[in-house]
């Protein structure tokens, strides 16, 4: 089946789209990417999304106009990726602007902006969307959703495999080996903490939005990190909490950046960005170290995906702190960096049609595995 997958992450960079074909066993499908596109949001739309997600005041009219603009942008991206309209369905994540994990007796909640009926009409095909709500309703974290999909797309090897997504938030998937005592272990995954979100916000704030991210890590490269601050931050409650766990800009956003800026003993932009970059790498390394201490699991391979994989400073710092693992870009196994997440949501849409559960207790803490997503048709 031909399926479109569309994704925009917490960094609000734009929309990545793939046109893929899936056949065979849904647990280990045969798949190929026919086409892929990436479209950056125009600066005014990107800033509106960030402002809304940071809690800035929006009228009802402004919210409707924002949701229409996002939906129309998704439609443009879909038509660009599939100009002949061969896809039968589209799996569309929508634009995340709020994510609240469950806490105690309070269930979690997540908001992805998308007018799915409008999108279905604009692209004239069935749209599967709202993938997180059912997991949350069943007591899960609602994120991350990609670990089961990573396992299906990438498969197992002789040891544990890890896939690290460096979006606004860093999340990790762990795929058990194909043989040995861990063969029957479940796929694991969780949100580690900030990857790009604090770095991007710092760059935007310090450059008055002339820059939106640290291109090629050049700002961080020329800075001196505050390791005392990093060590202090790594002891915060979220980083000590075991999985399942999820997070977002609500926890690691502008207010969090401002708090951290008061705790750094260096005031220059390059030192701030360097500190935040190494902090992101340390968060990931600490989680993998804790995984080994608690479960005796140490991946032999770590594939890195997402926009942060294109930051050579962040990539290098992760490599330095993950010794004993073969650390490489996910592009080396045939999945382009920007295609990995839209490919997983294309697969999740296919799974929805097949009535195959896309969530797992071992990953999100959901009470039972569930088929994810909601269908809307163009007619």
Swiss-Prot record:
Task of the protein: Catalyzes the specific phosphorylation of 1,6-anhydro-N-acetylmuramic acid (anhMurNAc) with the simultaneous cleavage of the 1,6-anhydro ring, generating MurNAc-6-P. Is required for the utilization of anhMurNAc either imported from the medium or derived from its own cell wall murein, and thus plays a role in cell wall recycling.
Pathway: Amino-sugar metabolism; 1,6-anhydro-N-acetylmuramate degradation; Cell wall biogenesis; peptidoglycan recycling
Signal sequence region: none
Biological-process GO terms, alphabetical: 1,6-anhydro-N-acetyl-beta-muramic acid catabolic process; amino sugar metabolic process; peptidoglycan turnover
Any matching Pfam family: AnmK
The reaction(s) this protein catalyses: 1,6-anhydro-N-acetyl-beta-muramate + ATP + H2O = N-acetyl-D-muramate 6-phosphate + ADP + H(+)
Key words, A-Z: ATP-binding, Carbohydrate metabolism, Kinase, Nucleotide-binding, Transferase
Annotated InterPro entries: Anhydro_N_Ac-Mur_kinase, ATPase_NBD
Species whose genome carries this gene: Prochlorococcus marinus (strain MIT 9211)
Taxonomy, superkingdom: Bacteria
Protein name as catalogued: Anhydro-N-acetylmuramic acid kinase
